[in-house]
Amino acid sequence: MAREFSRTNRVGQQIQREIALILQREVKDPRIGMVTVSDVEVSKDLNYAKVYVTFLQLDIDAERIAEGLKGLTEAAGYIRSLLGSAMRLRVVPELRFYYDQTLVEGMRISNLVSNTVRDDKRRMAEAGREEDEAAPDDTTEDKA
């Protein structure tokens, strides 16, 4: 039976922290810019690590994402060597970088929900005004 927190999960969390520090302090590639390491998945044999990253530029497009991932991929050997000196592992995993879409998708869904709520409130207000306009006419007819 697998434990709730297996060794691969613990190693993945530690690798995530170390890579975040390395990217913040050591890697000076302008293509990368401000990057956040959102998750790391390590293979069971600890030979490979999928590193999920998010770029923090406001005007990010597919071209800049590809450029940032290319910069990270080219710096993967350097990051791996720094990771090896920071952690005690028999084999330091080969790093593979992927763009994490969850933040972008979360913001898109949040905007959709906000727009829907705003539209519903507007429709309710318009429907309320129509009822209010119809109601005074009905009361004047009753008095006459």
Curated annotation (Swiss-Prot):
Coiled coil ranges (UniProt) are none
Report the InterPro entries cross-referenced here: KH_dom-like_a/b, RbfA, RbfA_dom_sf, Ribosome-bd_factorA_CS
* PROSITE patterns from the UniProt entry: RBFA
Give any Gene Ontology cellular component.
cytosol
Q: Where is the composition biased (Acidic residues)?
A: 129-144
Family, according to the entry, reads as follows: Belongs to the RbfA family.
Q: List the disulfide bonds.
A: none
Summarizing the function annotation, the protein's role is: One of several proteins that assist in the late maturation steps of the functional core of the 30S ribosomal subunit. Associates with free 30S ribosomal subunits (but not with 30S subunits that are part of 70S ribosomes or polysomes). Required for efficient processing of 16S rRNA. May interact with the 5'-terminal helix region of 16S rRNA.
Q: Which Pfam families match?
A: RBFA
Which parts of the sequence are annotated with region: Disordered?
Answer: 120-144
Keyword Cytoplasm: yes or no? Answer: yes
Record's PANTHER family?
RIBOSOME-BINDING FACTOR A, CHLOROPLASTIC-RELATED
Oligomer and partners: Monomer. Binds 30S ribosomal subunits, but not 50S ribosomal subunits or 70S ribosomes.
Identify this protein by name: Ribosome-binding factor A
Q: Which UniProt keywords apply?
A: Cytoplasm, Ribosome biogenesis
Single GO term (MF): ribosomal small subunit binding
- One of the GO biological process terms: maturation of SSU-rRNA
Q: Which NCBIfam families match?
A: rbfA
Q: Where in the cell is it found?
A: Cytoplasm
Q: What is its main location?
A: cytoplasm
